[in-house]
């Protein structure tokens, strides 16, 4: 029987499956407890989503995504009224202001996702890409 891979996106850490931490043991930065704190302490311009990756009905991967809306930052473009600043502001607001990250934007390293060693990692990564 060919395994069926799927994903579920959770908007709150309180919605995460009970066995989430079984995979998060590799990094505290993906644990339910850490994600709950991250969710509560996130700045107003950032939203967190948590992705569960499933092989049939079994959780085989977990990931964190963050959406950052830089339009909400106060520090961009209020310095002066010259044409150069105006052009920069238009370009920034229309092309560079929405960022989707897989992982935590304040951490480096392997803290974006965890995949079970027992699963087909290529298929799980393809499923994460679809999410």
Name each model feature, range by range.
Residues 1-131:
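N-acyltransferase acceptor-side catalytic subdomain
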